[in-house]
Amino acid sequence: MATNKRTLSRIGFYCGLALFLIITLFPFFVMLMTSFKGAKEAISLHPTLLPQQWTLEHYVDIFNPMIFPFVDYFRNSLVVSVVSSVVAVFLGILGAYALSRLRFKGRMTINASFYTVYMFSGILLVVPLFKIITALGIYDTEMALIITMVTQTLPTAVFMLKSYFDTIPDEIEEAAMMDGLNRLQIIFRITVPLAMSGLISVFVYCFMVAWNDYLFASIFLSSASNFTLPVGLNALFSTPDYIWGRMMAASLVTALPVVIMYALSERFIKSGLTAGGVKG
């Protein structure tokens, strides 16, 4: 009787999981199929799930700079995402280590402030950031967006990295100090390598936030040559002669870097999240 209950429970679980996957993946499947349909077939009054005539014209179009400067937008997004992520992780290492290892006045207040940040929406920072960026004279530049993305991701980076550093035994660093290493040497020779899975997790998080950002990019960038992919895609959607297949192709190619990055770093992300959630 107990075996039958377990079997039924397992069947129900896998059926529910299959239904969830179908609901989740079906829109992406439709996007993929639409990207292979011709312009007229994509808006047909009698749509089909699979293309009647397969075509790669939309993928060719998005890489044609005369039609859509996808490569330029991709480069801008890549520069902003990589640079802001590297800066956020580097500063996060220093801040997280200080909160995890050093004892100083106001430490708990600073630590609590990182929790408080999560209570506020990012849009509340638009006005102060806009004033700072215009005062610095970097409006409509990649640097403006890099600074904004670091501002957005740094609190989370510090919060997550502190959890990882808390799992590293103090005895390891004490032994290193006895061998003559200073604080910076300990951080980059011992602490950082031991927390590498956590660093990769934080980098992927920061990269995804910067790569997918539309709000700040649409406010701080005005020249088409500086657009990132989210803003560029919105411009593509706003054209009067929009072509659904081209939009779906551009959207899918835009999502590929994040998907590939997550797939390659999945093992590190899982181990990093596990390590960061356990104290000891």
Curated annotation (Swiss-Prot):
SUPFAM superfamilies: MetI-like. CDD domains: TM_PBP2. Pfam families: BPD_transp_1 (PF00528). Residues 74-265 form the ABC transmembrane type-1 domain. It is found in: Cell inner membrane. InterPro entries: BP-dep_ABC_trans_perm, MetI-like, MetI-like_sf. It is a multi-pass membrane protein. Residues 1-10, 75-77, 139-140, 211-214, 264-280 are cytoplasmic. Its main location: membrane. Keywords: Cell inner membrane, Cell membrane, Membrane, Transmembrane, Transmembrane helix, Transport. One of its GO terms (cellular component) is membrane. The chain crosses the membrane at residues 11-31, 54-74, 78-98, 118-138, 141-161, 190-210, 215-235, 243-263. Belongs to the binding-protein-dependent transport system permease family. MalFG subfamily. This is Inner membrane ABC transporter permease protein YcjP. It comes from Escherichia coli (strain K12).
